[in-house]
Amino acid sequence: MQVAPGIHRLTQGVVCFYLIEDGGKLLLVDAGAPKDWDVLVGSVSALGRKLEDLDAVLLTHAHSDHTGFAERARTTAGAPVWIHQADAEAAKTGKGGKNDGKATAYLLRPEFYRTVFSLARRGALKIVPIHEVSTFADGDKLDVPGHPQVVHAPGHTDGSAALFLEDRSVLLTATPW
């Protein structure tokens, strides 16, 4: 679904990830769960593009429902993977980003269980390590399609980040809770 000019939301279960078109290149923001790969491939094809057009992958944080197929995109499409420096080690080791400390409260919400079962079916209960990552910090304007500016938003994880696309007046966030 196109949510703004050249910005496409790819949804699988409760997780959203985005493809940003910029000229002949694509930027992937977040990488869903490991089994969401086919969603990416189908979406790229529907845009009349090839995986080789994927220029970079930006991760908003190091949780398995956002890093899922990032390593596969890196090795298959040759797209470098970027993440905030505070979550880089978690992404590389597969240990997961530090939680926001509210996990117990989630247990009281019925949607928590639907989310966990959805993530389990899609292979997202464990982070797939990303062997090579580049890092960004608050305020960085990245030289990737869309030229997003990083807005560090710690809380959900220490390295949670939003991405501001100034020329499109769009702020992409990840898990809002």
Which sequence ranges carry the predicted segments?
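Conserved beta-strand scaffold positions in the cores of enzyme catalytic domains, especially
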Residues: 7-9, 81, 133-135
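A generic local structural motif
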Residues: 14-15, 42-46, 67-69, 136-138, ...
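Active-site metal-binding motif and surrounding structural segment of the metallo-beta-lactamase
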Residues: 37-88
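Metallo-beta-lactamase
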Residues: 33-35, 88-177
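Conserved beta-strand hairpin/beta-sheet module of binuclear metal-dependent hydrolase folds
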Residues: 1-47, 162-176
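Active-site neighborhood of phospho(di)ester-bond hydrolases with catalytic His/Asp-centered motifs
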Residues: 29-32, 55-62, 81-84, 152-155, ...
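Active-site-flanking alpha-helical
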Residues: 68-69, 91, 162-163
